């Protein structure tokens, strides 16, 4: 499969938008905040970089592979995570690449609604025992660093958005890889989440 934006790693930890920048592979113009941003990250000078994930804005795949691994529209309803699930299926048997000889263009910045979080949880249930997947050599320390970063970012967003239905799940994922430094960085978001809960209780009497 070929696309224009992706990641060389899929962590075991849940991730909403990839992970550490060093694993990004891209040749893409993105529309964000009224601007068009050029993003280019490649592995060496080759025209194609191997990846695990390809962003769903463009997925180029042979029809025979598509027939073998179609989108799971029953499990991943409402748009989100179908592409990550599809990519992991392909990566387990074939190969995924980011093309650098042509630039793609993406006009959406994505959304983080409740459906997205629900589908993240479903994805984790399906693939937890098979992750992480990587196409680059990584030491155990580098793997743990990537896992901690992804788990921290996910838990932080869940807290800051007050997604109480997903806090227990995010917390359990984070505890696998927590560090003292990450705990300190999360403190402000945990306090913000507590304030959100207090306001909800006051509002509903």
Ranges and model annotations:
Residues 10-16, 55, 105-114:
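Short catalytic/ligand-binding loop motif for oxyanion handling, primarily in non-cytosolic enzymes
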Residues 20-45:
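A contiguous catalytic/ligand-binding core that recognizes phosphate-bearing ligands
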Residues 40-61:
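A recurrent flexible, glycine/aromatic-enriched loop bordering the glycosyltransferase active site
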Residues 53, 63, 67-89, 96-105:
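Donor nucleotide-sugar recognition loop
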Residues 142-205:
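Non-catalytic, C-terminal membrane-associated alpha-helical segments of glycosyltransferases
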